[in-house]
Each structure stands twice: as structure tokens, then as C-alpha cells.
């Protein structure tokens, strides 16, 4: 939690650094090196976002406390999926969420970080497809 709070404090001071650091948390260094157009596209999207609004959303992420009673009301089959190397929304957090949501399945994407749906699209999509095929 302390890391996330420190990150939030740093984001308030330096918009450029916060975007670059976000992308380094979201993608592996190898992916960034090999996929400059994707990196630049997402960087451009972040650049267009209001920094003030970004900070509001991140503040909510930093200080919000989940209400397990509300989460326990979810009864729909649910896939909780994250990259195994996600440092922001850690796999432990997702696994704990899957323990609270009845009828949920927890999966990690090997070598993935926060945007594993982009970086590891094939395995991510296979995992989602298998979940849908087994639960619909």
C-alpha cells in the first residue's frame, strides 16, 4: 500500500514521469523495446488524458476500501485475470478477490504485466475464450 501511496504523491508532481512509469509497470521492457508503435500509441492516449482527472481516479484507487459484503453479492460466473508480474494490481489481490466472489475463477497470464491483454494477447484471449466456453 505504501508503494501505491508514494506513486500517487510522485504523480501529483510530475506528469511526464508518471506516464513513463505507468507504462513500465504495464508492459515488460522487452515488449516496449519490440513494440514501439504500441508504446507510443498508449503514451499518446495518456498524454491526451486530463492529468487532474487521472489523479482523481488514482486517488480513488489508492484510498478506496472494498466492501466485501457488496462483492459477495456477485453470483455470476466471473473470470478474475491478471498478469503474473502486475505490480499495481498484484496477482495476490486478484486471487483474494476470486475467493470472495462465488463462482469465480482466478487465472494469471504468464510473463504478463498490467496490460497483459495487449502484451500477451494470444494467451489472454485463449483464457477468456476457455472461460466463456466452459461457463455459458
In which residue ranges do the predicted regions lie?
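Short alpha-helix in the alpha/beta-hydrolase fold that links the catalytic acid
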Residues: 76, 90-99
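Flexible "cap/lid" loop of the alpha/beta hydrolase fold
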Residues: 1-20, 25-26
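Catalytic active-site module of serine/aspartate enzymes centered on a nucleophile-bearing elbow/loop
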Residues: 104-136
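Short, surface-exposed alpha-helical segments at coil->helix boundaries
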Residues: 5, 39-40, 91-95
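A short, basic/aromatic alpha-helical/loop segment that forms part
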Residues: 48, 64-65, 84-88, 115-119
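Hydrophobic "lid"/C-terminal helical patch
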Residues: 22, 58, 97, 124, ...
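Short beta-strand/loop motif that positions the catalytic acidic residue
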Residues: 74, 80-82, 86
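Hydrophobic, aromatic-rich cap/lid helix
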Residues: 40-67
Amino acid at each position: 500500500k505504501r508503494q501505491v501511496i508514494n506513486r500517487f504523491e510522485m504523480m501529483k508532481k510530475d506528469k511526464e514521469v508518471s506516464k513513463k512509469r505507468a507504462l513500465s509497470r504495464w508492459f515488460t521492457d522487452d515488449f516496449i523495446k519490440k513494440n514501439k508503435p504500441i508504446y507510443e500509441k498508449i503514451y499518446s492516449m495518456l498524454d491526451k488524458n486530463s492529468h487532474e482527472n487521472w489523479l482523481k481516479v488514482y486517488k480513488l484507487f489508492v484510498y478506496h476500501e472494498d466492501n466485501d459484503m457488496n462483492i459477495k453479492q456477485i453470483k455470476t460466473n466471473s473470470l478474475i485475470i491478471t498478469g503474473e508480474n502486475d505490480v499495481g494490481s498484484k496477482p495476490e489481490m486478484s486471487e483474494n478477490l476470486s475467493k470472495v466472489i462465488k463462482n469465480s475463477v482466478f487465472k494469471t497470464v504468464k510473463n504478463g504485466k498490467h496490460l497483459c491483454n495487449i502484451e500477451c494477447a494470444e494467451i489472454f484471449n485463449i483464457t477468456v475464450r476457455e472461460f466463456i466456453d466452459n461457463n455459458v
